[in-house]
Regions:
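Catalytic-core regions of glycoside hydrolase
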Residues: 1-165, 171, 209
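Charged, amphipathic alpha-helical linkers/stalks
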Residues: 153-196
Length: 212
């Protein structure tokens, strides 16, 4: 109110993050045009992608200093939807695909696919944009993940395989298809889902993949 009285058009970003995942029970935002919601699902899994599921889990109760934060995408989106029920202003995703999870995928092919699907899914879950919290030196083995991110944010109808084929041809010339096949194999053999700890540690099939 004081900003409005002073004639200031300053906008304020507020976070849905850690303890603030839980929406308020009593307070409300009066001037939605003043505020922008930032969804920051820092403990989410990258084995799943953003979708607007028909059935979402109920929110667990808020218990100060005893909180368990959601890992599944559905559980994180459930918190987002609870906030959207009381705030329908502008919003964006602040996410961490290339902050650390790329380390679980040495080939970067599976995380690149997740990024593409998440960029396409932003509108489906009611978000208007994306800010990437990431390291800057993210181009080993390739810059595909960044390329996919940029192109799919620009056009949500972008086809992942078309971008990947174009990228590898542009970067490696006639060897592009072979380079892509190699990195697809690296991603598959390491199995990011396993490295994230989302499968049993003792896994004979995974041991065989590592042996290759």
């Amino acid at each position: 109110r004081r900003l409005s009285e002073a004639g200031l058009a300053t906008r304020i970003v507020f976070l849905i993050y850690v303890d603030l995942l839980w929406p308020p029970l009593e307070q409300t935002i009066v001037n939605k045009d003043r505020f922008v919601l930032m969804f920051a699902p820092i403990v989410r899994t990258y084995s799943e992608t953003f979708e607007a599921g028909d059935t979402l889990p109920e929110l667990p109760p808020f218990e100060r200093n005893k909180l368990a934060f959601p890992k599944s995408v559905d559980a994180n989106v459930a918190f987002l939807k609870a906030w959207q029920a009381i705030f329908d202003g502008d919003s964006f995703d602040f996410d961490y695909h290339l902050m650390w999870d790329h380390s679980n995928d040495p080939g970067h092919m599976q995380i690149a696919r997740t990024i593409a699907a998440d960029m396409q899914g932003l509108g489906k879950i009611g978000l208007n944009g994306y800010v990437s919290c990431q390291i800057q030196r993210i181009f080993l083995p390739t810059g595909l993940a960044m390329t996919v991110m940029g192109r799919t944010l620009w056009n949500a109808a972008t086809d992942f395989d078309a971008v990947a084929d174009d990228y590898f041809r542009s970067a490696f010339g006639a060897d592009g298809p072979a380079c892509r096949d190699y990195l697809e194999r690296v991603s598959g053999l390491f199995d990011p889902v396993y490295i994230r700890g989302e499968k049993e540690w003792v896994d004979a099939e995974q041991a065989q993949r590592f042996a290759r």
